[in-house]
C-alpha cells in the first residue's frame, strides 16, 4: 500500500485546539471491525460497551514540560524539545535554530540555567546541563508543555492538567497518549465497580509520533524508536483475561504498540507471552496480524500518519477510511484534544 492511500481532506475547523470542558463528554464513534457498521455516542458510553472481565490496558507515561527556549552565548535564539532524558544531567533533544549548534556550544536558558551541546546523533542533539539540579527538576521549572504543532497556539496553564492523563505515573513522554485523556476519575471508578480490570504499560511517546512519513511505499518507512515496558503483572492479567473469556482493550495506539511488541518479541524467542523492557520501533500497517488486542480506544489521527495505518490494520482499511469520512461529515473533533473511537477488531 501507499502513504497516499491514507490521505484525506480535513477542514481546519475540525482540528481541536482546546479540550472539552469535561474529559468524558467527548463524542465517541463506535466501529465494528467486521461489518464496518458505525454508531455515535459520548465517551462515557464506554461504561456500557465494556463488560465485567474485560481488561483495560492504559499507558501510564507522564508528559514532561519538554519545550524550552534559550539562546547561544553569541545571542542566536533557539528552541529545544527534549526527546529523551538520558540521565539526571543529559538529554537527547531536537534543536531549532537559524544555525545548528556545534559541539561545545553553550546554551543559556531561563532562570539562570545553562546547557552544553556535547554531541550530535543524527537529527538529535545531546545536551548536558550544568549544576546539581536533575534535568526533570529544571524542566518542571522552566519547561513548557510540548503541544503538537497542529494545535497552533502557545501552551497555557490549563494544558499542564489537560494534556495529561489522570492516571499518569512515569515521567518521560513528550506527547500525551491521547486516548487516555478522555478518562476521568468518576468514569474509572464506575468501570472498576462494574468489574472491568485495569493494567498499565509504559511507552514514553516521542516527538517522532508527529513526523510525517516521507516515503510512498509503506514497506520503505523506518519507524522511530520509543522506550516501552510491559511488566510481568500485565502479562499475568492478559492471560487471566483470556482464560475467563474477557477482552483485552487497548487504550490508545501506544498501548497497542507496547503489547504487540511484547507479543512479537515472545514469538521471535519461541517463548510464551513474556514481559518486555526496551526500545520498540514496531510499525503496524494493513497485513499485520494482531496477537493480543481485541478492542481499541483511540482518537482520530493525522492524514497519512502511521497511526491511521495501525487503526486500518485493526479494523480494515475501507472500514476505517469510511468511518473517518463519516466523522468529518458529522463534525467530530480531530487529533489530540479531539473525540474518540471505540473499535472492535476485524476477524481474519
Curated annotation (Swiss-Prot):
Transfers and isomerizes the ribose moiety from AdoMet to the 7-aminomethyl group of 7-deazaguanine (preQ1-tRNA) to give epoxyqueuosine (oQ-tRNA). PANTHER family: S-ADENOSYLMETHIONINE:TRNA RIBOSYLTRANSFERASE-ISOMERASE. It catalyses: 7-aminomethyl-7-carbaguanosine(34) in tRNA + S-adenosyl-L-methionine = epoxyqueuosine(34) in tRNA + adenine + L-methionine + 2 H(+). Pathway: tRNA modification; tRNA-queuosine biosynthesis. It comes from the Bacteria. Monomer. This is S-adenosylmethionine:tRNA ribosyltransferase-isomerase. Belongs to the QueA family. It is found in: Cytoplasm.
Amino acid at each position: 500500500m501507499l502513504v497516499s492511500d491514507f490521505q484525506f481532506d480535513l477542514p481546519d475547523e475540525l482540528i481541536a485546539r482546546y479540550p472539552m470542558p469535561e474529559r468524558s463528554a467527548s463524542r465517541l464513534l463506535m466501529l465494528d471491525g467486521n461489518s464496518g457498521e458505525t454508531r455515535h455516542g459520548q465517551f462515557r458510553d464506554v461504561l456500557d460497551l465494556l463488560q465485567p472481565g474485560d481488561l483495560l490496558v492504559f499507558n501510564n507515561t507522564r508528559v514532561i514540560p519538554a519545550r524550552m527556549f534559550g539562546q547561544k552565548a553569541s545571542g542566536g535564539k533557539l528552541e529545544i524539545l527534549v526527546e529523551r532524558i538520558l540521565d539526571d544531567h543529559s538529554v537527547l533533544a531536537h534543536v531549532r535554530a537559524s544555525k545548528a549548534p556545534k559541539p561545545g556550544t553553550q546554551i543559556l536558558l531561563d532562570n539562570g540555567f545553562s546547557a552544553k551541546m556535547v554531541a550530535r546523533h543524527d537529527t538529535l542533539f545531546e545536551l548536558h546541563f550544568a549544576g546539581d539540579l536533575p534535568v526533570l527538576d529544571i524542566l518542571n521549572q522552566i519547561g513548557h508543555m510540548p503541544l503538537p504543532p497542529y494545535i497552533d497556539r502557545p501552551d497555557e496553564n490549563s494544558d499542564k492538567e489537560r494534556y495529561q492523563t489522570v492516571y499518569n505515573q512515569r515521567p518521560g513522554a513528550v506527547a500525551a497518549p491521547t486516548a487516555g485523556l478522555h478518562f476521568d476519575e468518576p468514569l474509572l471508578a464506575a468501570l472498576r465497580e462494574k468489574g472491568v480490570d485495569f493494567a498499565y504499560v509504559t511507552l514514553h511517546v516521542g516527538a517522532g509520533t508527529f513526523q510525517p512519513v516521507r516515503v510512498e511505499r509503506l514497506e520503505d518507512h523506518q519507524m522511530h524508536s520509543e522506550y516501552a515496558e510491559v511488566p510481568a503483572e500485565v502479562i499475568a492479567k492478559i492471560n487471566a483475561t483470556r482464560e475467563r473469556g474477557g477482552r483485552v482493550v487497548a487504550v490508545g495506539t501506544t498501548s497497542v504498540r507496547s503489547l504487540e511488541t511484547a507479543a512479537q518479541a515472545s514469538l521471535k524467542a519461541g517463548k510464551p507471552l513474556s514481559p518486555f523492557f526496551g526500545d520498540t520501533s514496531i510499525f503496524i500497517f494493513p497485513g499485520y496480524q494482531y496477537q493480543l488486542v481485541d478492542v481499541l480506544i483511540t482518537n482520530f489521527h493525522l492524514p497519512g500518519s502511521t497511526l491511521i495505518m495501525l487503526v486500518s490494520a485493526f479494523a480494515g482499511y475501507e472500514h476505517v477510511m469510511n468511518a473517518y469520512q463519516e466523522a468529518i461529515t458529522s463534525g467530530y473533533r480531530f487529533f489530540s484534544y479531539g473525540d474518540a473511537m471505540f473499535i472492535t477488531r476485524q476477524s481474519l
